[in-house]
Amino acid sequence: YCEKHGFPYERIKGKGAEGRPERTTAYLNMVSRIVDENLAKLKSLPFFDENDKKKYFDLLPDSSSLKKKYSELINKGHECSERSQIEDELNKEIKAGSIDVNIMVKLDKINYDKNKEALSSEFTDAKLALKGYAESCLKSSIIFSAGINQTLFGYMSNFKDFYRDEVGDIKKKIILKVSDFRSALIQGKFLAKKGLEVYEFRIESGLNCGGHAFPSNGLLLASLLKEFKEKRSQLKEQFAPIVQKYYESKGWKYTTRENEEVLLTVQGGIGNNGERLRLMNEYGVDATGWATPFLLVPEATGIDAP
């Protein structure tokens, strides 16, 4: 991909665990650079043509204020006196999606050196992946799934990007996949003791999770979401004081932002837009996740040639 996009390429030494964080960092930085270049190309495309810029706006939901402004421009036509100003405003609002990274926390095997001696704990698979992400240039989120790994969560405290800067921004946010409210509280409190804040709880039912079942108490998604809706305020109330205490112990400034709330999202088993709207309106979730056929993407998985 470096060759394809004309980027300089330097081979990273080391096999297996050696060099893995550096390779992960280099890969993520490359993806970010490709996205930035493609975004710039998209912005440079003309309006009123059948191109990727039109496709970008067409894919936005009808409720989007950006799509409404775009539709106004198209309806006014080429000769619109405000065309240049509106086009500039629209181009400024075109943004790329977040390049998020997922770690299945239980996939954390111990690695060995060439003499078959076990490497120290910071060289386990999940920690190497975390280090690679933490040292990348990305401003995005890391998603932890498949359970809780306390040593991995504790390892995050080595990287400043997971903490607030002086204006209250967090460069690398934390998303936790959880199966119930109790799990959200337990994991959220553990992270809070390290000064780490959960940006989003991604709720997934063990009975209806779109492709893989896992052990649970057998509660249907509606029951899980009802509890989150009723107890949502507890998430901020219980975590924030613990986080602030950690910052004080480090002598760091803790800058808050207006209207800060932990996001609640849900994924799995959503079949149509009506179901999405019901989940958002009835249970107050901030977003929904739909299945993607990632196993058919050559860059994501090894697949047989047709």
Language model regions located:
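Short, basic, glycine/proline-bearing loop/turn elements
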Residues: Y112-K116, I170-I175, E261-L263
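Gly-rich Lys/Arg/Thr-decorated short loops/hinges at beta-loop-alpha junctions or inter-strand turns
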Residues: M104-N115, S136-L138, G168-D169, A213-F228
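Glycine-rich phosphate/ribose-binding loops and adjacent secondary-structure elements
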Residues: L176-I186, A192-P306
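Short, composition-biased local secondary-structure segments
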Residues: A96-I103, L152-Y163, S233-K250
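General structural signal for secondary-structure boundaries
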Residues: Y1-H5, N149, M156-D161, P293, ...
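Extended, well-ordered protein cores
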Residues: E122-L176, Q187-K194, E204-G206, G211
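Long, compositionally biased, glycine/small-hydrophobic-enriched stretches that function as flexible linkers
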Residues: Y1-F153
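Short, mixed-charge, low-aromatic patches
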Residues: E82-E87, S141-F144, L191-E197, R232-L235
